[in-house]
């Protein structure tokens, strides 16, 4: 297969890392932000065009956020495992290993999505009951969740396909596919809600349909590329060794992401006891704050992929330099995004719900969480650095302790003493700070740049 680097791809093994990190990260951030904006369109449209049911409808979509996040983030983590395995193989110039990993990832995504879709229909109602979703919100939330889960095969397929493209340094094709499907998502939202007078069922159907389009676009592109990641239908099967390697890296990464979502489910259950307005406010604020997270996380993904390829090629010094520059550039981008979001917070919240009480409560969340993203940047970059070397279990376990443990304990022991929205929000900076310290300790203990120094090739670090 061809090894020529095309204009929309990035050569991670040679040349300046400083210039290439943002070229990789910014399209990833744009892709994630577009995903959030299209999800936000669900919230905004039901919040503005469903009449008296607007607050209940917004709360229904928001109440599902932690559940959907847990499932999707678990598989996105596994997709990141595929990204690392493919990137390592590319660095080693082993096209056969790349081919096996690519086809394994595609089949696993579809099969895993189908399993989640079927299981989800059975457990959707019990999950929402565990979350203490208010009675007036429950039927809307259940309808949205069941429809959304039916679309899991195409949702997961898109994410695995995007991971495959990113492993070769192509972050623009996934962005383009999402842009096309996202516009379709918004148009379908408007059609179903305004023209057909549907509520949460309309935006859920639109989301599934749009994801099917983006997955189809990337699949067609993969079948037509001349790169080593080309997909051939006759080769679509699971390779045991490739799957084992993908899961060994991806499953801990997925668990790490899912732990956040699980902890957020616990927090959501506490927020749900504060009433429909608090749920709607938290949902609206989340759709704003996640934009800053998408920016910093894109540099973590860039760090993982760059380190993955260079580790495979035996360029260990270049791996350490990647981590350092990811910190610097990620910090600049995160600072800018946080400042912009805080300055425009109330206006952004009003897009989702014009209720003054919702805006006031939503601002409390943003003012508490956004400044704490400095801790988020630390553990995301360092976790991405470790994963690039195939070290995935330690970050997952430490995140489970720092995030999940602290947040569950907070809701169980601290929240009952002062049952206010602000009390719930304080757990975010505390748990994020603790996790950053734990992951930093892990890097200092593992010291991968020294541990793998013997693999360093003679190629100069340019």
Give the residues covered by each predicted segment.
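Transmembrane helical elements of multi-pass membrane transporters/channels
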Residues: 23-42, 147, 181, 210-214, ...
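Small-residue-rich hydrophobic transmembrane alpha-helices
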Residues: 58-118, 155-174, 268, 279-345, ...
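Small-residue hotspots at the loop-to-helix junctions and early N-terminal turns
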Residues: 55-66, 141, 145, 204, ...
């Amino acid at each position: 297969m061809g090894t020529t680097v095309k204009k929309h791809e990035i050569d991670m093994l040679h040349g300046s890392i400083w210039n290439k990190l943002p070229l990789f990260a910014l399209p990833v951030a744009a892709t994630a932000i577009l995903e959030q904006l299209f999800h936000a369109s669900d919230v905004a449209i039901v919040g503005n065009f469903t009449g008296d049911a607007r607050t209940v409808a917004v709360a229904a979509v928001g109440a599902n956020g932690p559940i959907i996040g847990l499932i999707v983030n678990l598989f996105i983590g596994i997709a990141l495992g595929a990204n690392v395995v493919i990137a390592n193989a590319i660095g080693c110039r082993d096209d056969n290993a790349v081919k096996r990993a690519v086809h394994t990832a595609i089949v696993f995504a579809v099969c895993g999505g189908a399993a989640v879709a079927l299981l989800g229909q059975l457990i959707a109602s019990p999950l929402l009951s565990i979350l203490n979703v208010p009675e007036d919100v429950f039927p809307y939330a259940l309808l949205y969740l069941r429809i959304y889960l039916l679309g899991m095969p195409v949702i997961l397929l898109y994410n695995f396909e995007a991971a495959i493209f990113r492993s070769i340094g192509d972050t623009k094709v996934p962005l383009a596919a999402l842009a096309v499907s996202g516009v379709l998502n918004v148009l379908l939202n408007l059609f179903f809600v305004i023209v057909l007078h549907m509520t949460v069922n309309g935006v859920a159907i639109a989301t599934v349909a749009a994801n099917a389009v983006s997955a189809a676009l990337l699949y067609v592109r993969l079948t037509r590329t001349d790169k080593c990641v080309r997909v051939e239908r006759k080769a679509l099967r699971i390779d045991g060794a490739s799957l084992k390697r993908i899961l060994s890296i991806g499953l801990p990464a997925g668990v790490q992401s899912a732990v956040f979502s699980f902890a957020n489910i616990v927090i959501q259950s506490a927020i749900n006891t504060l009433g429909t307005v608090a749920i709607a406010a938290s949902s609206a604020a989340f759709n704003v704050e996640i934009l800053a997270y998408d920016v910093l996380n894109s540099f973590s993904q860039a760090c993982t992929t760059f380190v993955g390829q260079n580790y495979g090629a035996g360029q260990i010094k270049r791996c350490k330099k990647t981590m350092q520059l990811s910190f610097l550039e990620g910090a600049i981008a995160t600072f800018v995004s946080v400042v912009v979001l805080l300055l425009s917070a109330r206006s952004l919240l009003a897009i989702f719900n014009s209720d003054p009480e919702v805006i006031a409560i939503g601002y409390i969340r943003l003012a508490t969480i956004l400044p704490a993203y400095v801790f988020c940047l630390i553990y995301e970059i360092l976790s991405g650095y470790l994963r690039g070397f195939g070290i995935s279990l330690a970050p997952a376990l430490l995140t489970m302790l720092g995030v999940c443990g602290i947040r569950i304990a907070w809701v169980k022991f601290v929240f009952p003493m002062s049952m206010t929205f602000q009390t719930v929000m304080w757990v975010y900076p505390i748990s994020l700070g603790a996790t950053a310290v734990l992951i930093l300790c892990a890097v200092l203990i593992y010291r991968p740049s020294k541990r793998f120094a013997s693999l360093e090739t003679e190629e100069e670090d340019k």
